[in-house]
């Protein structure tokens, strides 16, 4: 039996693009952003943070200002866009940690550079991902938090001491834990275990069926607990498109029929093709989350991280229903 949910949809803190529009591309336009965002809002996502990845300052400035102008043109859309997530440029440039980001555009943590980015975002920067082990990361974290920006650790090679130092400086989350790190790490001193062990940090993770296997998702559920978990998509520009070959985040990418989005040459994932609705159904299929747990992971916890009242999230064209045997669906 289907039950209509009281939430307007899910909240996604990491959306890099949708239906062919890349928020970090030099080809981004106001019209393109509006089209991508409005389309995403029809797929079960009620609110999200447009996410820009590591890039040179000129392009970050350009694209932040394009999105700001787009939101001033579209008052309806502006209510669903909760601000920006900057996933870089203050990350690690080391292989494995840098992922699909451009290592040449990585910057050392800098309060001055952060202030420029925040200005270009029209004060709408809500989440910042930084490498916990980078010199100056703790100073930047304190500064960002003082400006009302949540800080998340990610794309790094941090150990337990680094992660604890960032938590002490005010960081409150981990960006897509289990990804953005080398395939092979020290069995004890590694970003994955360091992040899980730090109880002060929420765990952002990508349950799209490709970034993390089922047994790892279950480990996260049991080790972190639902109060710390935040599902995100890490959706790339190929999300919402049919299988094929695409340019994604500056990478040649293949979108397989099963939804896996990857670069065959680098042998790495280049974001996700999933929506929050699809990710939440992956979690439901694990059988270890109650409906209340799922709603916390996909709606309440992300809003708590960025300090947004759930009552502020407006309704969408489609509501969400839930059935124990079928999971979530659009109404």
Identify the role of each PLM range:
Residues 9-11, 152, 173, 231-232:
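Residue-level marker for buried hydrophobic side chains located in beta-strands
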Residues 86, 93-190:
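Divalent metal-binding pocket/active-site signature
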Residues 16-24, 34-63, 79-92, 121-133, ...:
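Divalent metal-dependent hydrolysis catalytic cores, especially in the metallo-beta-lactamase
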Residues 162-293, 308-309, 325-326:
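Active-site-adjacent C-terminal substructures of enzyme catalytic domains
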Residues 304, 308-331:
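C-terminal cap of metal-dependent C-N hydrolases
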Residues 291-302:
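Short, well-structured alpha-helical segments that form the helix of a local strand-helix-strand
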Residues 1-7:
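Histidine-rich, glycine-flanked metal-binding segment
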């Amino acid at each position: 039996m289907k039950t209509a949910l009281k939430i307007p949809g899910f909240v996604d803190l990491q959306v890099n693009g949708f239906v062919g529009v890349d928020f970090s591309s030099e080809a981004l336009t106001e019209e393109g952003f509006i089209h991508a965002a409005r389309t995403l809002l029809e797929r079960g996502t009620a609110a999200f943070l447009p996410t820009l990845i590591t890039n040179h300052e000129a392009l970050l400035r350009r694209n932040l200002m394009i999105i700001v102008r787009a939101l001033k043109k579209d008052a309806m859309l502006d209510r669903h866009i909760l601000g920006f997530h900057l996933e870089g440029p203050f990350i690690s440039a080391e292989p494995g940690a840098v992922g699909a980001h451009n290592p040449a555009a990585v910057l050392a943590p800098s309060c001055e550079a952060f202030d420029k980015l925040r200005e270009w975002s029209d004060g709408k920067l809500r989440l910042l991902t930084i490498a916990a082990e980078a010199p100056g990361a703790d100073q930047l974290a304190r500064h960002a938090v003082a400006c009302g920006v949540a800080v998340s650790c990610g794309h790094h090679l941090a150990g337990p001491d680094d992660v604890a130092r960032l938590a002490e400086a005010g960081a409150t989350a981990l960006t897509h834990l289990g990804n953005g790190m080398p395939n092979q790490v020290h069995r004890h001193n590694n970003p994955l275990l360091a992040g899980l062990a730090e109880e002060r940090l929420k765990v952002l993770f990508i349950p799209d069926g490709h970034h993390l296997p089922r047994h790892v998702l279950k480990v996260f559920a049991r080790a972190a607990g639902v109060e710390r978990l935040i599902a995100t998509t890490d959706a790339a520009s190929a999300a919402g498109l049919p299988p094929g070959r695409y340019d994604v985040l500056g990478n040649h990418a293949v979108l397989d029929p099963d939804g896996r989005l990857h670069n065959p040459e680098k042998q790495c994932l280049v974001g996700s093709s999933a929506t929050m609705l699809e990710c939440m159904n992956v979690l439901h299929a694990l059988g270890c989350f109650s409906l209340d747990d799922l709603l916390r992971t996909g709606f309440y916890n992300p809003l708590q991280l960025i300090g947004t009242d759930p009552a502020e999230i407006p309704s969408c064209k489609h509501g969400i229903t839930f059935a124990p045997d079928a999971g979530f669906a659009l109404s």
